[in-house]
């Protein structure tokens, strides 16, 4: 479930071997509550606001250190980026090529360890 929370950011990271089109299918239709967007069921919502939700993949799916990948999160704080890297490493993510982040949102993970379009929820 996702709850609007000012000044919070929820992050998912990992490695995906999907093509960009396959990767993007997961969030296709996210701003249309009548769509069958696959992310809706995983996130427990019927709408995802693209003003706050970002999907990112590295060029050509290049796998990079988690420290490099985390720089793509729009956290606007070096401390937050360092915290994301720390938690990612605690969850076994040392490198990757893809991430999602949702600004002003708190995600409550009902099934810890679940993959969301190949990505792990970081926090």
What do the predicted segments below correspond to?
Residues 32-123:
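Low-complexity intrinsically disordered segments
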Residues 1-27:
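Short, extreme N-terminal segment that most often corresponds to the first beta-strand
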């Amino acid at each position: 479930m996702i709850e609007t929370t000012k000044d919070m950011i929820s992050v998912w990271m990992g490695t995906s071997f999907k093509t960009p089109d396959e990767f993007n299918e997961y969030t296709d239709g996210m701003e249309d509550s009548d769509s069958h967007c696959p992310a809706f069921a995983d996130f427990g919502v019927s709408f995802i606001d693209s003003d706050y939700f970002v999907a990112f993949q590295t060029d050509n799916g290049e796998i990079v250190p988690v420290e490099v990948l985390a720089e793509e999160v729009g956290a606007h704080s070096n401390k937050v980026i360092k915290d994301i890297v720390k938690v990612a490493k605690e969850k076994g993510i040392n490198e990757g090529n893809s991430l999602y982040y949702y600004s002003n949102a708190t995600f409550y993970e009902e099934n810890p360890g679940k993959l969301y379009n190949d990505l792990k929820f970081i926090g």
